[in-house]
Amino acid sequence: MTLQQQIIKALGSKPQINAEEEIRRSVDFLKSYLQTYPFIKSLVLGISGGQDSTLAGKLCQMAINELRQETGNESLQFIAVRLPYGVQADEQDCQDAIAFIQPDRVLTVNIKGAVLASEQALREADIELSDFVRGNEKARERMKAQYSIAGMTSGVVVGTDHAAEAITGFFTKYGDGGTDINPLYRLNKRQGKQLLAALACPEHLYKKAPTADLEDDRPSLPDEVALGVTYDNIDDYLEGKNVPQQVARTIENWYLKTEHKRRPPITVFDDFWKK
């Protein structure tokens, strides 16, 4: 088995999907989890205005709507959380995503004060954060806020991780990568677009250039620039297609060096890191 085949198997990717079937699969997955653990009353998700959180948010609200109708349990809710750092450049996209999702509840937590306070506390301990590490600080502060909200609403935190993100480890460890449940896991980037198109999402929300937008020195840096490969390259690779050798090498290098991000903390029983 080639490394490409191993990766595809590990991430559960498929070369082709039926958008309606995958929508139903994700919604039923969320519903089943909530029904298995009836003490869970809310799904909590940060909404950025990008493709992934827009899709995950819509699926969450669909699952909650169906469960409320089927069970009569009005205590169930989906909480969309806006988590800007100061003023967000694409704020209108965030509002458009909220309008599309129609969440039960919308909360806004501006993380800038908390990030600056943390940075100052570290500075007083003689630790000066680089711009890149400050970006990770933002991602972790966003997740901390979501877990606080989940803790106070008997909820779980929903993630937006998908195959095209997981393969490159393009997430912050214990930031956006630290979640309870990931309904998009298995899908690549273009497949996520297919689901949003089937859900009649405004096109500009999934046709925009994806960006984590964490670095102050490089605002709105496109993911594809940071990664050195395009999402079309990554999606082709995940669909088992032939890609240029240098592209495959770049993707596989990302996969191998970020393996620790896809695993629980390393213990004496692990040996993957020795290979």
Curated annotation (Swiss-Prot):
Protein name: NH(3)-dependent NAD(+) synthetase
GO MF annotation list: ATP binding; glutaminase activity; metal ion binding; NAD+ synthase (glutamine-hydrolyzing) activity; NAD+ synthase activity
Binding site for deamido-NAD(+): 140, 173, 180, 260-261
GO terms under cellular component: cytoplasm
Residues reported to bind ATP: 46-53, 160, 189, 211
Role according to the record: Catalyzes the ATP-dependent amidation of deamido-NAD to form NAD. Uses ammonia as a nitrogen source.
Family, per entry: Belongs to the NAD synthetase family.
Residues annotated for Mg(2+) binding in this entry: 52, 165
Pfam family, any one: NAD_synthase
UniProt pathway: Cofactor biosynthesis; NAD(+) biosynthesis; NAD(+) from deamido-NAD(+) (ammonia route): step 1/1
Gene: nadE
Stored Gene3D superfamilies: HUPs
Species the sequence originates in: Shigella boydii serotype 18 (strain CDC 3083-94 / BS512)
Record keywords, A-Z: ATP-binding, Ligase, Magnesium, Metal-binding, NAD, Nucleotide-binding
E.C. designation(s): 6.3.1.5
Subunit field text: Homodimer.
GO biological process, one term: NAD biosynthetic process
Catalytic activity field: deamido-NAD(+) + NH4(+) + ATP = AMP + diphosphate + NAD(+) + H(+)
